[in-house]
Regions:
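Active-site loop-to-helix junction immediately N-terminal to the catalytic Tyr of the SDR YXXXK motif
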Residues: 107, 147, 151-159, 171, ...
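Conserved glycine-rich cofactor-binding loop
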Residues: 13-15
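Short C-terminal tail/terminal secondary-structure segment
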Residues: 150, 230, 241-253
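Alpha-helical segment proximal to the catalytic Tyr-Lys
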Residues: 132, 174-178, 238
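Conserved glycine-rich Rossmann-like NAD(P)H-binding loop of the short-chain dehydrogenase/reductase
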Residues: 29-44
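Active-site helix of classical SDR
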Residues: 127, 161, 169
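Substrate-binding pocket helix/loop in short-chain dehydrogenase/reductase
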Residues: 89, 103-104, 108-116, 210
């Protein structure tokens, strides 16, 4: 019998995904994390997780290309057997994504299709193909955005994909509940990362404005999100499913 539960975190080599992976490891879980192109960054996260006393593996995954998902899960199955001595993992965190800031009237079909593939089609079919390896009683954690609740010009396409993920979350929870699989979605507000070119982190004017519009008086930090996701990967969250959990500090109330 394996000692630790296992979480698979997409986009776990940097930004919020890295923080999620480390926060999950601090809860005593082992981690499979994915990266798109930055293998060296992913390997460093693996080392940090191992330093916490947990096992970790980094695998390449392009979430935009669903034709590669079947091969990816063959690699996951091999890693589960070789590194973790099991054939199942417990939690899937659909974190990988990009942001495109473009006015509705100027968004191109190529930009729209890119967002669909990465932010909706990818997580939809990745979750579907994960099911044979996802243990009963486990969970799926999807990632949304505060922009699905409030509107900021330039994010029509991005926020629409996240709105679709919020609807999908409820259907997944309904259809997978018979297996004890919980499905929730976490919606971060403005966070200081390199997302969107680091605008929230590096632009003092933007940072100050967003802080002034937040009940808790500041913008978010990666630690504010990683801990929420990690909590959902524990038995303490066993009675929580089909929920949208916004972690924004109370933006635009």
């Amino acid at each position: 019998m394996r000692q630790s539960k296992i979480a698979l975190v997409t986009g776990g080599s940097r930004g919020l995904g890295k923080n999620m992976a480390l926060a999950i490891a601090k809860k005593g879980l082992d981690v499979v994390l994915t990266y798109n192109s930055q293998k060296s960054e992913a390997d460093e996260v693996v080392k940090e997780i191992e330093a916490l006393g947990q096992k970790a593996v980094a695998l390449q995954l392009n979430v935009a290309d669903s034709t590669g998902f079947e091969g990816f899960f063959k690699a996951v199955g091999a890693a589960l057997s070789e590194t973790f001595s099991t054939d199942k993992f417990d939690y899937l965190v659909n974190n990988a994504g990009i942001g495109i800031h473009k006015a509705f009237a100027e968004t191109t079909t190529d930009e729209f299709d890119t967002l669909v593939n990465i932010q909706f089609k990818g997580p939809f079919f990745l979750s579907q193909l994960a099911l044979p390896l996802l243990a009963d009683g486990g969970g799926i954690i999807n990632i949304s955005t505060g922009l699905a609740r409030f509107s900021t010009p330039g994010y029509a396409a991005y926020a629409s994909m996240k709105g679709a993920m919020e609807t999908l979350t409820k259907y997944q929870a309904k259809e997978l509940g018979a297996k004890g699989i919980r499905v929730n979605i976490v919606a971060p507000g403005a966070i200081e990362t390199d997302f969107g070119g680091g605008m929230v982190r590096d632009n003092e004017q933007v940072n100050n404005f967003l802080a002034s519009q937040t009940a808790l008086g500041r913008v978010g930090l990666p630690d504010d999100i990683g801990g929420v996701v990690a909590f959902l990967c524990t038995d303490d969250a066993r009675w929580i499913t089909a929920q949208r959990i916004e972690a924004s500090g109370g933006m635009f109330l």
